[in-house]
């Protein structure tokens, strides 16, 4: 919005030309989201407390968590509003990738909101049924995946529609351009053609998987938001590179017109996340809830797909991956041993993994900060793939 206004007035006020610079708008988006979050955070927490939107805590978890019962949840609304206002103020409204990411982010946020609402109203920690939640995640994820399958390599929505029709008329068979290939980190000449179906399936898995992985990680004060900020910042760098024809050519990446604008979204995400951390740091004044975790995870997955860095997301978001795998391994091993021995056995003291360390004697703050440090290292490894190829 401000970009269009600045372009309209820049002939009379030359200093407004600075708004044309992507890096300037990214910095301003970050600061705007940060200030909105810090300014309205106390009010949001107070309102959530008045509405008795308190977190229900499972009694089977670490006993130290019982004191958290009643802490306001659904604080992710503050994060999403900060991101939305900041992004819409500083982005180019004509950029289609911005709207795709916003669709996924707020679509998944709506799913999380319903889930949190049911937990609060019915005092049931389970919230929405897994089947219902998965259905809506799948619907939104597939819509985004189908659109991105044809839009990543094309700059015109008209051309995207033509490619889609050609794909349908051709019996769901269509040659995809190089830009749609799966990029393998550290190898500049290795990429794998996915085809339309492969692209859609991979995109769906990345978006839905990332959303649920972030949600599973959100279990301790401040644990998930800092890794989200770090990974989002890393993806913002990739967005800037992929959207710049000079840098992408120099670094031997495919140029994706319009991808650079996602730097605005990632910057706003980082600013909103840091503002939320101000109130979510131990002892937390507010919890994110599914409304924030599902949305932010979906956002990271969508950005990663657009900038063709699905594998790098897997690396940078290693904490999310390990937390998810710990749950899968715990459930699988429990079922196998129950079938074999008549009683289920556990691989970990408790899943997700952060609870395993808590029950092993680590303080909550130790788990959180150590996971942050690991994420910092993983993000640096991910960023190193820009040049080490």
From Swiss-Prot:
Regions that span the bilayer: 25-45, 74-94, 97-117, 134-154, 190-210, 222-242, 259-279, 286-306, 311-331, 366-386
Membrane topology: Multi-pass membrane protein
Reaction(s) the record says it catalyses: UDP-N-acetyl-alpha-D-muramoyl-L-alanyl-gamma-D-glutamyl-meso-2,6-diaminopimeloyl-D-alanyl-D-alanine + di-trans,octa-cis-undecaprenyl phosphate = di-trans,octa-cis-undecaprenyl diphospho-N-acetyl-alpha-D-muramoyl-L-alanyl-D-glutamyl-meso-2,6-diaminopimeloyl-D-alanyl-D-alanine + UMP
UniProt xrefs under InterPro entries: Glycosyl_transferase_4 (IPR000715), PNAcMuramoyl-5peptid_Trfase (IPR003524), PNAcMuramoyl-5peptid_Trfase_CS (IPR018480)
Cofactor(s) the protein requires to work: Mg(2+)
Entry's localization field: Cell inner membrane
Family under the similarity heading: Belongs to the glycosyltransferase 4 family. MraY subfamily.
Cellular component GO terms held in the UniProt record: plasma membrane
Top-rank EC class of the record's enzyme: transferase
Signal peptide annotation: none
Protein name: Phospho-N-acetylmuramoyl-pentapeptide-transferase
Statement: the UniProt record of this protein carries the keyword Iron: no
This protein's pathway: Cell wall biogenesis; peptidoglycan biosynthesis
Top-rank lineage group of the source organism: Bacteria
Organism in which the protein naturally occurs: Cupriavidus necator (strain ATCC 17699 / DSM 428 / KCTC 22496 / NCIMB 10442 / H16 / Stanier 337) (Ralstonia eutropha)
Protein keywords: Cell cycle, Cell division, Cell inner membrane, Cell membrane, Cell shape, Cell wall biogenesis/degradation, Magnesium, Membrane, Metal-binding, Peptidoglycan synthesis, Transferase, Transmembrane, Transmembrane helix
Record-listed E.C. numbers: 2.7.8.13
GO molecular function, one term: metal ion binding
Keyword Cell wall biogenesis/degradation: yes
GO annotation terms (biological process): cell division; cell wall organization; peptidoglycan biosynthetic process; regulation of cell shape
Function: Catalyzes the initial step of the lipid cycle reactions in the biosynthesis of the cell wall peptidoglycan: transfers peptidoglycan precursor phospho-MurNAc-pentapeptide from UDP-MurNAc-pentapeptide onto the lipid carrier undecaprenyl phosphate, yielding undecaprenyl-pyrophosphoryl-MurNAc-pentapeptide, known as lipid I.
